[in-house]
Amino acid sequence: MTESPKRIVVGLSGGVDSAVAALRLVRAGHEVIGLFMKNWEDDDTLTQCSAEDDIAAAVAVAEHLGIPIRRVNFAAHYRREVFEHALQELRAGRTPNPDILCNRHVKFDRFLRHAREQFEADAVATGHYARTGRAGDGEPALLRGIDPSKDQSYFLAGVPRQALDAVRFPLGDSTKETVRAEARSAALPNFDRPDSTGICFIGERDFTQFMQRYIDPHPGPILTEDGREIGRHCGLAFYTLGQRRGLGIGGDRNRDSSAPWYVAGKDARRNALFVVQGHDHPWLQSAAVSTEPFHWLAPVPAEGARLHAQVRYRQEPQAGQLSHAEGGRVVFRFDEPQRAATPGQHLVLYDREQCLGGGVIDTAHPADRSAPPALQTQSTEVV
């Protein structure tokens, strides 16, 4: 069904996706206003894609489409509601997902309120590859984008459910190739601009070097599974479960295997980083995960519900069983052990194409009971 014309504020980032989202809304007859959100104050000249370049691209798109464009600075909100939380998580030895927090607190809270208050907008739109629909209770539902390689519903699992009625995702029914072709056909001035990569406030910069501006290095031992020290780390905050690159350790002359090393866990008491050899080492496998209070975007499923889950973006959905715990927490037991399920990241649940919501992983329960109980990133608690 074609939607009647509405006043829609589009978040124009300067990228191709948001540009095509605006293009489609204009062609559908809506009154479209572009809004460029500045969410990070540049503090150096190292970024390959500076805010000035992004603004220039967004303005060029708006002029090409004949729509007005405004700017808003949410940097203070972003720092308080996203970045400071990320720092707190990193200092605790966990691995946060700032993009999920940004969508929850900035893009689909601050942005939506700003659009309503300043422009009396009926809705906001972004270039996310996701869709909306109706759940069984008649309330709004978040659905996967049809392109599995670009589906971004994982990053939207923390969005306030009540906001979904006022959100439009014009690209949800498209593939990236279709969007690129449409941008080229419409002669959008940024049709060949590369996709952005990296964490939103870091961009293409080295993660460890950037974060050392805010978190003091705290060196400690790198230990093997049998407790031998084979190197030194610069601080537990700068490593994540399953990480291979940047460890500064090569082969071990005292072992038969030349397999690469991976981070398997952290012992905060000893300030020790544990590593193992082999991509699929048993210490990297989790039988289940527990979360902090879960954020539901749908009616709460029954105890024992069979669902699918992701513990990272672009992961193949994994089957398992849901259990409810005290305080709105959940436990999800996987049918097959999952590699590098990481505290601080999000468990996102799905019922077929519907995203049911997400929760921050606080414990990954190892499939291998021989993993040391002291490791901060995993628990040997029976689930």
Swiss-Prot record:
One of its GO terms (molecular function) is tRNA binding. It catalyses: S-sulfanyl-L-cysteinyl-[protein] + uridine(34) in tRNA + AH2 + ATP = 2-thiouridine(34) in tRNA + L-cysteinyl-[protein] + A + AMP + diphosphate + H(+). Residues 97-99 are annotated as: Interaction with target base in tRNA. GO terms for cellular component: cytoplasm. The keyword Transferase applies. Its EC number is 2.8.1.13. Catalyzes the 2-thiolation of uridine at the wobble position (U34) of tRNA, leading to the formation of s(2)U34. This is tRNA-specific 2-thiouridylase MnmA.
